[in-house]
């Protein structure tokens, strides 16, 4: 039986993200759904997009972060993460780059929700300052 992909051009990005979360059906889907909720709580004006053949992307005056799923991690890549303060040390991947930073979430990890929302706020503020 052929596995169907949630990606179709006629569906909205939000519906495609819904489908991805459901399709995963494991801790990765639950984690991606939880992160999505936190992003929307932190920035009610966030725009959900679907890029690069199936990557959920959250934007506000530019890309805030992406939500990639792999076998062992959910990776949240912040497009301009290197320019963001991270006093809680959430960034734990892509630390050598000049622009991006990422948070790799493993199955038993707990995300500091308050610190994550602060990162979203900071990413929005940075994008807004660059949009002027």
Task: State where each predicted segment sits.
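Charge-dense, helix-prone N-terminal extensions
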Residues: 1-132
């Amino acid at each position: 039986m052929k596995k169907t992909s949630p990606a179709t051009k006629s569906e909205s990005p939000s519906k495609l993200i819904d489908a991805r979360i459901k399709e995963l059906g494991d801790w990765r889907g639950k984690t991606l759904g939880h992160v999505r909720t936190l992003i929307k709580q932190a920035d009610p004006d966030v725009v959900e997009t679907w890029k690069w053949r199936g990557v959920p992307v959250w934007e506000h005056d530019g890309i805030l972060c992406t939500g990639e799923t792999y076998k062992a991690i959910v990776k949240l890549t912040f497009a301009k993460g290197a320019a963001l303060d991270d006093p809680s040390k959430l960034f734990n991947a892509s630390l050598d780059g000049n622009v991006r930073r990422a948070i790799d979430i493993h199955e038993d990890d707990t995300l500091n929700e308050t610190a994550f929302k602060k990162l979203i706020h900071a990413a929005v503020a940075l994008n807004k300052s660059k949009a002027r």
